[in-house]
């Protein structure tokens, strides 16, 4: 199975750090966020990795080629960030037609993916307990089926999931820039084709300066 790392965003909420450094290259401890997640994938048996890049993408590419010189890591280039959905659509020519693992580059975590299914009809999401910055949650589970409540949901999407490329191949999108959560998954959630599981392991979405500081604090306490 291949894996894709989403790494093309601007990281605006992490300014001024991301003025000259793309968010995936920000460090927790001595490692960049993306370095940690590549090591996570390699540790879990993934050897074919695709990374989409755009904003300051050349810095990400140079960093990865330097840190992982012998790895089979390919890059999907975007002239401007295409969003989570558009980024995947643009990378399908590299990813192929088989189910792949999708992971955000900007999460600090210790999530166990050993018990993930081998394939999915549409998508399989890993959820975590709602953090303070997302108390409304993203989705809920009943017998491993994903559904969305009108008000508060039980889980937050961790940024790790399995994706079946068919959900992109069988749809026509008005723009090449779009969000997978808003423009792709709802249709399949309503059809009962999106499954999920809950993780109780450590997880931080490093999307703001405060949460970057928190990730470093947690890292220092663990090491």
Language-model features: locations:
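Short catalytic helix/loop segments, enriched in acidic residues and glycine
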Residues: 20-35
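Short beta-strand-to-loop element that shapes/binds the nucleotide-sugar donor at the catalytic cleft/hinge
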Residues: 55, 124-141
């Amino acid at each position: 199975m291949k894996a894709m790392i989403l790494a093309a965003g601007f990281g605006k909420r992490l300014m001024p750090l991301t003025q000259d450094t793309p968010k995936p290259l920000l460090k927790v401890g001595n490692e960049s966020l993306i370095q940690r997640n590549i090591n996570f994938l390699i540790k879990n048996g993934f050897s074919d990795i695709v990374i989409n890049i755009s904003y300051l993408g050349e810095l990400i590419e140079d960093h990865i080629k330097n840190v992982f010189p012998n790895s089979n890591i390919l890059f999907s280039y975007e002239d401007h960030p295409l969003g989570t959905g558009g980024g995947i659509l643009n990378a399908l020519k590299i990813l192929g037609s088989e189910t792949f693992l999708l992971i955000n580059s900007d999460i600090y975590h210790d999530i166990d993916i050993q018990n993930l299914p081998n394939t999915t009809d549409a998508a399989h999401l890993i959820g975590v307990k709602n953090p303070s910055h997302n108390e409304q949650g993203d989705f809920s589970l009943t017998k491993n089926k994903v559904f969305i409540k009108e008000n508060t949901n039980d889980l937050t999407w961790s940024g790790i999931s399995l994706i079946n490329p068919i959900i992109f191949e069988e749809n026509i999108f008005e723009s090449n820039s779009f969000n997978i959560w808003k423009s792709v998954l709802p249709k399949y959630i309503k059809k009962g084709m999106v499954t999920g599981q809950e993780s109780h392991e450590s997880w931080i979405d490093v999307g703001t300066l405060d949460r970057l500081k928190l990730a470093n604090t947690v890292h220092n306490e663990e090491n």
